[in-house]
Amino acid sequence: MHPALYTRASMIREIAAAVAFISKFLRTKGLMNERQLQTFSQSLQELLAEHYKHHWFPEKPCKGSGYRCIRINHKMDPLIGQAAQRIGLSSQELFQLLPSELTLWVDPYEVSYRIGEDGSICVLYEAAPAGGSQNNTNMQMVDSRISCKEELLLGRTSPSKSYNMMTVSG
């Protein structure tokens, strides 16, 4: 299989989890019909897959994590903004529907988020690496993912929050 096709296929579940999470915010407010939500979701999935295609490293999940991070911090993430434009949603409407501070990490085998700068990090999606049946390999992957989040927390000036884990296994 061509490496680009393998990469795109390997990120489908992670992207779907991230898009479903963002779409729930839009659905909750009830300002959009089902067709608009589907168009938004499909557009965002396509945009993320294209954006991540050369930055997806299942063998090193932390590599490229910052590039793949979806971020709203009083400024809209450009990919979410593009998907919203495709359904005629203005940036002002989008800011009313989504949290003003949201960080969403879309990494191989894990999708996690944080709402607010001092919020807890919660896991949306988690999967074991495919083909790695050796416990030692799997343990290294888990340690690697944890260290990605630890790197983020090391730069924090306020006391760190405890992790509240919400896990959905695929």
Swiss-Prot record:
Pfam family, one: BTG
Record-linked PROSITE patterns: BTG_1, BTG_2
GO process annotations (BP): negative regulation of cell population proliferation; positive regulation of angiogenesis; positive regulation of endothelial cell differentiation; positive regulation of fibroblast apoptotic process
UniProt xrefs under InterPro entries: Anti_prolifrtn (IPR002087), BTG (IPR033332), BTG-like_sf (IPR036054)
GO molecular function, one term: enzyme binding
GO CC field: cytoplasm; nucleus
UniProt xrefs under PANTHER family: B-CELL TRANSLOCATION GENE, PROTEIN BTG1
Family note: Belongs to the BTG family.
Known role: Anti-proliferative protein.
Protein name (Swiss-Prot/TrEMBL): Protein BTG1
Organism: Gallus gallus (Chicken)
Gene: BTG1
